[in-house]
Amino acid sequence: HSCLVGSEMCIRDRYDIANMGLNSAEYIHIFTEAKKLAYEDRAKYYADMKFTNVPVKELISKEYALERNKLINLKKAGSVYDSGIFENGDTIYLTVADKDGNMVSLIQSNYRGMGSGMVPPNLGFMLQDRGEMFSLDPNHRNSLQGGKRPFHTIIPAFITKDGKPFISFGLMGGAMQPQGHAQIVVNIIDFKLNLQEAGDAPRFRHFGSSEPTGEIMLDGGFLSLESRINDQIRNELLKLGHNLKGVNDEKGVYGGYQAIMLKDGVYYGASESRKDGHASGY
């Protein structure tokens, strides 16, 4: 628990606390928001260090605290915060191309929580656990059965033009993948955005559809819009009968996109701001 004191004290490195005044509204607001951030880390990471790796050094570092404190809105109390950057591994996507016009679109995921936790002896990689995506209804087409491949969400995307490689791209994010891929393609083809703009543009995501695992959609599910989509559009969607619900933008719910395009003999690369990564040439 003592780590929390250090985390909350780091607000002094970003704000002029002394000039705010003892127990002023501004001081109490900032302190409370810093507490919310620190306690999200507490909820996720704090446990017996004999049994789990707790990133104490990182959690109490000034650099980490300053980065977290950037999330504080000085004009409004936060209703939802997430824990910090020390996430478990998840889906990765990369694409590469060579001087001859060959492209590779690669996406890899062991599924939930870095897979099954089972490592084949002497092989050094962990087995996936996508068997979770089977339906337990024996009459379902996607029912659990030995030797059968389960439903999965992995999509390494590729677009050809006149039979030749044009765009190699991918968008991580579980069930967001087909929605995100379609939005990216529409952004490029119909809205004429360039490769980077197509990924950086605000996205939307529908939740709650029926699933291959047997779940059934109820009440039409709900629609979530990124915060950059304005209130006028939100109000129009409400009038159309959509259920709107906010979700935490920081968890990758809107996907993570990277791409390479070959146009007129020139390669273009893109890596969006929602995720780690970059585009580079050689």
Question: How does the language model describe each region?
Answer:
Residues Y15-N110, N122-L123, R130:
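Internal maturation/activation junctions in enzymes
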Residues S83-E87, Q145-F151, N248-G252:
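Short Gly/Pro-enriched turn/cap motifs at secondary-structure boundaries
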Residues H1-G6, I11:
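Single conserved hydrophobic/aromatic residue that forms the stacking wall/gate
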Residues S7, G89-L94, M103, N122, ...:
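Short glycine-rich loop/turn motifs
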